Amino acid sequence: MAPSAASGVSSLPSGFAVFTTFPDLLFIFEFVFGGLVWILVSSSHVPIPLIQGWVMFASVFCFVATTVLAFLYVIGAHGNRTSWITLDAAYHCVASLFYFGASVLEALAAIQLQDGFLYKYYHENISAVVFSYVATLLYVVHAVFSLIRWKSS
């Protein structure tokens, strides 16, 4: 058995070290860009409710879950248990998939807005697409480094 697994010591930070260690400092950027996606999609015109419904679900779910997970890390709720490393890796993999699907669907919705809608709504949706892909990239990077941390635990 690996020494860290045998002793139950986790490499997850707690307290404000969450915001200074990589990949956990990505929580801040996931929070910001996820919030921007949520705000932009909710303020724009909805040409295809089913598509943008999934985008809203994915962005709100990831926004809330990221906020809760970051808060739990800050208060040290993981208690140095290695199961939290697994939770972190699993969550960020799922969030990456959710956001990738949401990004593709939001791009489709933006294409539908290109003709026949106000230019303002088109720009809001294009901005949502860009921020959604940035959020996807952040979640993928966090997932990769969380999987590396999980593998070494």
UniProtKB/Swiss-Prot annotation:
PANTHER family: MARVEL-CONTAINING POTENTIAL LIPID RAFT-ASSOCIATED PROTEIN (PTHR22776), MYELIN AND LYMPHOCYTE PROTEIN (PTHR22776:SF12). Its main location: membrane. Residues 1-24, 76-92, 148-153 are cytoplasmic. The chain crosses the membrane at residues 25-46, 54-75, 93-114, 126-147. It is found in: Membrane; Cell membrane. Keywords: Cell membrane, Lipoprotein, Membrane, Transmembrane, Transmembrane helix. This is Myelin and lymphocyte protein. It is a multi-pass membrane protein. It comes from Bos taurus. One of its GO terms (molecular function) is structural constituent of myelin sheath. PROSITE patterns: MARVEL. GO terms for cellular component: membrane; plasma membrane. Pfam families: MARVEL (PF01284). Interacts with PLP1. Belongs to the MAL family. GO terms for biological process: myelination; protein insertion into plasma membrane.
